[in-house]
C-alpha cells in the first residue's frame, strides 16, 4: 500500500503512469486554511489566546483603570498570533506537499513533507465513504477500507479520520468543493464495482470523532 517515493513522478501525485485504460478524473490538495482549522485547531487556538487576554484584562481592571489594563492583554494576543502563524505554516507545508488523485480505478494519496509516501486505494478495497462538508464548501471524504488493509495512523496523519487510531481510515482532508469530489468518487466507484455507501454527515460531528 504505502510506498516510499524517491523517483521523479511521471505525473504529479502518482509514482508511475496509470495503466492503459485508467483515466485521471480529479486531482487536488487540501485547502491550507481549512486544513489549519480542521486538523490543527487554528480557530480553537486563536480563541484560547483571546480568552486569556480578556481574562488578564478583566483581572487587572479590578485594581486599575481599564485603559491601563488593556495593554496587559497584548502579550497574549501577540503570542496567540505567533502560534497561529506557526500552525498555518505547518498546514501550508502539509497541503503543498499533498496531491490527491481519483482515477477510474482507485484513489491515490501522495502525502508527507519529510518522508513522501503514496497510498493507493483500489475501489475494491474501499467498503464505504463518509462525506463531511463545512459551511465554506470545503470538507473531508473519509474511506473505510477492507478489514485486511492495515494502515499507520501516524504515517497518514493528518490525512485520516481524527482520533480513529485502531481502525485508521484514510481521508481526502479539507478539500475545496468536497461534495463534487465525493460525487466524482461515487460515480467512478459505481462504474467500476457498484456504488459504495456515501453518507452525508454533520461536519462538526465527524471532526469530533
Question: Which residue ranges define each predicted feature?
Answer:
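Residue-level signature of catalytic and energy-coupling elements of molecular machines
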Residues: 26, 107, 181
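Acidic, Ser/Thr-rich low-complexity segments on the non-lumenal side of membrane proteins
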Residues: 111-151
Amino acid at each position: 500500500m504505502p510506498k516510499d517515493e524517491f523517483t521523479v513522478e511521471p505525473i504529479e501525485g502518482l509514482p508511475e503512469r496509470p495503466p492503459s485504460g485508467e483515466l485521471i478524473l480529479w486531482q487536488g490538495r487540501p485547502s491550507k486554511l481549512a486544513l489549519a482549522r480542521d486538523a490543527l485547531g487554528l480557530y480553537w487556538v486563536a480563541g484560547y489566546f483571546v480568552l486569556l487576554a480578556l481574562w488578564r484584562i478583566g483581572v487587572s481592571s479590578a485594581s486599575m483603570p481599564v485603559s491601563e489594563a488593556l495593554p496587559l492583554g497584548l502579550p497574549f494576543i501577540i503570542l496567540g498570533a505567533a502560534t497561529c502563524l506557526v500552525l498555518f505554516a505547518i498546514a501550508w507545508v502539509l497541503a503543498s506537499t499533498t496531491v490527491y488523485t481519483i482515477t477510474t480505478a482507485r484513489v491515490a494519496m501522495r502525502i508527507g513533507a519529510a518522508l513522501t509516501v503514496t497510498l493507493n486505494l483500489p475501489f475494491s478495497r474501499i467498503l464505504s465513504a463518509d462525506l463531511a462538508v463545512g459551511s465554506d464548501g470545503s470538507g473531508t471524504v473519509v474511506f473505510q477500507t477492507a478489514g485486511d488493509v492495515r494502515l499507520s495512523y501516524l504515517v497518514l496523519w493528518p490525512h485520516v479520520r481524527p482520533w480513529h487510531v485502531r481502525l485508521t481510515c484514510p481521508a481526502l482532508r479539507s478539500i475545496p468543493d468536497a461534495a463534487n469530489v465525493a460525487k466524482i468518487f461515487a460515480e467512478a466507484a459505481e462504474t467500476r464495482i457498484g456504488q459504495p455507501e456515501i453518507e452525508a454527515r454533520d461536519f462538526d460531528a465527524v471532526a469530533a470523532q
